[in-house]
């Protein structure tokens, strides 16, 4: 994914999500998947719910969803992980001669931006299991003060701050900084 400014996408909508996948960890033996709502709010999200919702948000047809879910199930089965999938409510939206599958009971703000991320994990079962077992997802936005942006930029010890009244730049210490941030692969979703 392309990052432009402070490891966060420069966009007009400005929802930003940071995703951290441990480079090494033990796997869980059970994962419960539910559709969720992931937008601009400052929240820590469940990786399984985020990924399950992302599968729907990055798929245009029911068969595409089914194919991705089967790949996910095959990976979980190969790692001896039991699972449960909550209900996903969908409808088909038509635009001209094109038809799109849409979620009714959840969303990820500009979720289609996660297409490469979803495909990468479905093609790397070990990384997917690490993400679902011990991964981190932080949602937020970049329409706010740097103190709030620290919530999603946990791999940055200091963030740039600009005071518009004095036209001065400074650095602020990130209270959410993760000293072990190098133990994770980081991904950024924004738009």
Regions found by a protein language model. Name each.
Residues 1-2, 8, 15-191:
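Long, non-globular targeting/processing and low-complexity regions
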């Amino acid at each position: 994914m392309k990052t432009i400014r402070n490891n966060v996408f420069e966009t007009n909508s400005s929802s930003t999500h940071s995703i951290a996948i441990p480079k090494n960890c033990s796997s869980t033996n059970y994962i419960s998947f539910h559709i969720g709502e992931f937008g601009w709010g400052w929240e820590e999200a469940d990786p399984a719910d985020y990924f399950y919702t992302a599968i729907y948000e990055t798929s245009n047809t029911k068969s595409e969803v089914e194919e991705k879910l089967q790949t996910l199930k095959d990976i979980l089965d190969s790692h001896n992980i039991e699972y449960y999938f909550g209900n996903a409510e969908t409808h088909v939206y038509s635009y001209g001669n094109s038809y799109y599958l849409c979620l009714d009971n959840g969303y990820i703000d500009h979720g289609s931006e996660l297409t490469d991320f979803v495909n990468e994990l479905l093609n790397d079962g070990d990384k997917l299991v690490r993400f679902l077992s011990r991964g981190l997802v932080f949602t937020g936005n970049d329409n706010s003060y740097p103190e709030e942006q620290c919530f999603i930029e946990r791999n940055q010890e200091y963030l740039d701050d600009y005071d518009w009244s004095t036209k001065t730049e400074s650095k602020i210490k990130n209270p959410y900084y993760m000293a072990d941030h190098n133990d994770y692969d980081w991904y950024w979703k924004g738009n």
